[in-house]
């Protein structure tokens, strides 16, 4: 599956605000798009009932809402853990895992297809590095499970960047994804709900600790 359309989850609120100005739309339309994506969890342009029909058509024409294709699902014996294998738009494979623990619903998400770190104990490390995921591809992993949980009356409570790849080796996209998921007017997951796992890239760790992020 390939498409020239940008993945809508790659865009931040400021980009939507600029786009609405270019399209001659009032600025609040950007807020409605943002709310639709991250609060309502809508997965197609047609679902954006707060937008006029013409604007929904523009969104559908200009953006892709699907960057992940489900390839395989695996479940633990108790059904509390679900692993999903996805194919990206260029057919690279990644994994995302949902873990249900008591009141928590934790997602383990992927930041790279493959990994360049080469850890001998890690299956992903033995694959070699394929490519970085975009911020939108990281975000979409969360939104897909958020929609599934919402249908069960539940929400994502925690996100761990502990899937395939080294998050700090894909720093910009990983941080952009966290900022998008933590945005107060968007998905609004607090910073303490995120965990970033790293093999220990010291310059990136220093950068991460020096940056001010929402608590």
Walk through the language-model features, giving the residues of each:
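Conserved Radical SAM active-site core
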Residues: 92-214
């Amino acid at each position: 599956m390939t498409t020239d359309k940008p993945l809508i989850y790659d865009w931040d609120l400021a980009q939507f605000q600029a786009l609405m100005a270019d399209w001659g739309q009032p600025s609040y339309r950007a807020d409605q798009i943002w709310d639709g994506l991250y609060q309502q969890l809508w997965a197609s342009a047609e679902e954006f009932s707060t937008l006029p029909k013409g604007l929904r058509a523009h969104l559908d024409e200009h953006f892709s809402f699907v960057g992940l294709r489900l390839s395989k699902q695996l479940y633990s014996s108790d059904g509390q853990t679900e692993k999903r294998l996805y194919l990206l738009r260029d057919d690279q494979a990644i994994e995302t895992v949902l873990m249900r623990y008591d009141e928590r619903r934790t997602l383990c998400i992927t930041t790279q297809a493959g990994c360049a770190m080469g850890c001998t104990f890690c299956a992903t490390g033995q694959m070699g590095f394929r490519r970085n995921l975009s911020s939108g591809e990281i975000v979409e992993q969360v939104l897909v499970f958020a929609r599934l949980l919402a249908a069960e009356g539940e929400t994502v409570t925690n996100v761990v960047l502990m899937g395939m790849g080294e998050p700090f080796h894909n720093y910009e996209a990983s941080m952009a994804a966290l900022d998008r998921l933590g945005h107060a007017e968007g998905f609004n997951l607090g910073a303490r709900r995120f965990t970033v796992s790293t093999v220990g890239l010291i310059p990136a760790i220093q950068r991460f600790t020096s940056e001010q992020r929402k608590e």
